[in-house]
Amino acid sequence: MLASAGLLQTSLIWVAYAVAVALVLLVAIITTFTWQSPHERSVTVSIVAIVSLTSLLATVFLLPVDIALVSSTASAHLGAKKDWATPERIDGILLTLKVVYYTLYSFDALLCLIVIPFAYFWYEEYDEVEEEEGTSGAGARFWKAAKYTLGFVFLVLILFLLGFFVPAAGSGNGKHLDLDYFKRLLAANKGEKALTFGVGLLITLGTFLYTLYTGAGLALLPVSLIKSAPSISAPQLSATIATDLEHNRELQRQIEMRNAGRPDGISQKDRRELDALLREERTLVRRERLAAETRGDGRSGVFRAWTKIQAVFRPLKLLGGILLLLLSILVWASMLITGIDKAANSICKEHCGYILGHINVFQPVNWIFVQSAKAFPVDYILMALLVLFFFGSSITGIATIGIRFLWVRVFQIKKGRTSPQALLIATVMLALIILAINYAIAMIVAPQYAIYGTQTFCVNAPRHPGEQPDCREHRDMVRPCSEVFSEPAAKDVCTPTVMSTFLNRVTINWPVFGAIDFWAQFAFLGVFMVVFVTSLFRTPRLNLSELDEEAEVDEEEGLLASTGRRFGATWGDITGRAKNRNGYGTGGGEGSNGRG
């Protein structure tokens, strides 16, 4: 009966994970098709991007499952293992988790280093003219892409060989190795050591991207939601453009009338002015058409209804942005507290990647997770939402900053305008960033919860040798599990999560990775603070010249509005009527243009 109860609990956790992966697949599909350019869509690129994002998010979402499974083996109130949690059952649970982890990590590395580069070169080798003439077939295209991908295959082999043969830097003797927990971390075979080296290197590379893109996105995502309402309604924009267009055509008529009947034709000065007015007229006509599409003219009633629904729910986006802003500040403060605590109180400092024995200062995010774990499955839902928040922040950062080499923008990431090459590169960047997010959440954001979950142990001496300690009458003798406790009861009850063990194994075997990953968190906090303060005091403005360039590329793209009052714009979109505003116009030069 007890064994079946344990099986039921673990099965429910895996079922919840399967549901989460299904939702992750939906998120990956929506993300891919939202950002992909419809005119350059590639089936191969779309499939690779969707599979890659699904696999990477599934890897991160395995952390709540890991925590739930190890926590389910112990009673948090009594500090003892449950009756069904025999050593054999626990070993079976940990083995299953290891198999899933290693499979997903290996698959992620395969995607990032082989599959995605192959898809990139496969798309690059496509030539529409050669395809129509039949001079280039799929076979030739395949071999060209495979030839370029061989470089990444050699890179994978070199990484594996380095990890297999190079001695682990943390294998020397030291004071920090006296504890059994750290000895078990070093007790890894050659294959695991090679895998820890490869993953540690990928996490470190991802940490640099995470510091810049996720740090900026964590501040920009809430602010963008708060400032997301267009500053001028679509009806107001249409009225303004119509006025400017009428004024433009009136000036053209005046020039034509002024030069009518001249034997030598129109003067050079008037010709230059007329050409400028004609260019401006074409721009205004495009803006007028785009504004009409934004209003829903010529669209179905469903589209127009959806536009009005979006306008109605803009206040909810404002509220959601405020809540996410508070969450960002809470996460930032928690990470700062953990970082300072680890830097000051780590039991082994840089020798093991600043592993912290136990939390010495109140850490709000970790406390929230530990307390919410009492109401299953609230903590797992919160962890999933936190992962999605970091993931969404990373996308926001990449979209805002773009794909750059040093300070030069190579690719631009925009909704509905991202090229397949940019989408694949962004997918690799997200892959590396997600690995870094995995480290940050487990080691910095909620360290105690991510390592032992809700597990506790009883320090009361057992009545008979071989029995579990009994704290039913001594609840004050129940202690949270920690790496530094050496009591026999702690060794018997406390089971660390597979993820934390793997990450700690990376940092203790390769301390340079641990040191870089740890100190990069302070750079992450600095980037967040700079972007956060800047975005609060910087009024977003609309670059109409940029919109005109987009309109020339794709004249069917909807136009978001520019300057004015946000709440007046919202009401204008709901009612469908333009509000009179004297003195407003778009023809006053680029200096008067604004971004909504």
UniProtKB/Swiss-Prot annotation:
It comes from the Eukaryota. This is Probable lysosomal cobalamin transporter. Belongs to the LIMR family. LMBRD1 subfamily. Probable lysosomal cobalamin transporter. Required to export cobalamin from lysosomes allowing its conversion to cofactors. It comes from Podospora anserina (strain S / ATCC MYA-4624 / DSM 980 / FGSC 10383). GO terms for biological process: protein localization to vacuole. GO terms for molecular function: cobalamin binding. Keywords: Cobalamin, Cobalt, Glycoprotein, Lysosome, Membrane, Transmembrane, Transmembrane helix, Transport. The lineage of its organism: Eukaryota, Fungi, Dikarya, Ascomycota, Pezizomycotina. PANTHER family: LYSOSOMAL COBALAMIN TRANSPORT ESCORT PROTEIN LMBD1, LYSOSOMAL COBALAMIN TRANSPORTER-RELATED. The keyword Transmembrane applies. Residues 584-596 have a biased composition (Gly residues). Glycans are attached at residue 543. It is a multi-pass membrane protein.
